[in-house]
Amino acid sequence: MQSQEVQVIPVQQQDYQQWIPYWLAYQDFYKVCLPTKVTETTWQRFFDKAEPVYCAVAKQGDKVLGFVHYVIHRSTWAETNYCYLEDLYVSPETRGQHIGKRLIEYVQKQAIAQQCNRLYWHTQETNHTAQKLYNWVAEKPGIIEYRMPL
């Protein structure tokens, strides 16, 4: 297994059984529990060509090692679209092997291919492990996010 190369590819329907435990672990990390309907809708959007919501997985052979979700959207600050990297998760057993970096680079390539002006993402200020990776691959613009429940 270790000799097989890790590939980052668009998620496929047959990846669901491996994706779902990671998706739930990701929610646990952020102390949220999304309704099942949200998860089902999200999964369906990945395969709907009319939706600008995407998922890619890092795989070694048939084993999923992590995922990235991203959204292409309009901006009032540019004529071209932006790409928002919404979720990134790598299995704890394979962290430190540059899989997160490879998932980000995959999204970067997709954003360039779709002529996006910017790739951006958020993380918890206490997620220092992820910030080490993010500081390595991108710049921190000093933006503070505010949320208003609707």
Question: Residue locations for each model-derived region?
Answer:
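A short beta-loop-alpha structural element at the N-terminal edge
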Residues: 6-21
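Conserved GNAT-fold acetyl-CoA-binding loop/helix
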Residues: 20-45
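A short helix-loop-beta-strand connector motif used in the catalytic cores of GNAT acetyltransferases and
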Residues: 45-57, 84
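Conserved beta-strand in the GNAT
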Residues: 57, 63-72
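A conserved beta-turn-beta hairpin within the catalytic core of GNAT-like acetyltransferases
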Residues: 73-85, 95, 142
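Conserved acetyl-CoA pyrophosphate-binding loop and the N-cap/start of the following alpha-helix
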Residues: 94, 98-106
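Conserved active-site alpha-helix within GNAT-family acetyltransferase domains
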Residues: 101, 125-144, 148
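Conserved GNAT acetyl-CoA-binding A-motif
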Residues: 112-122
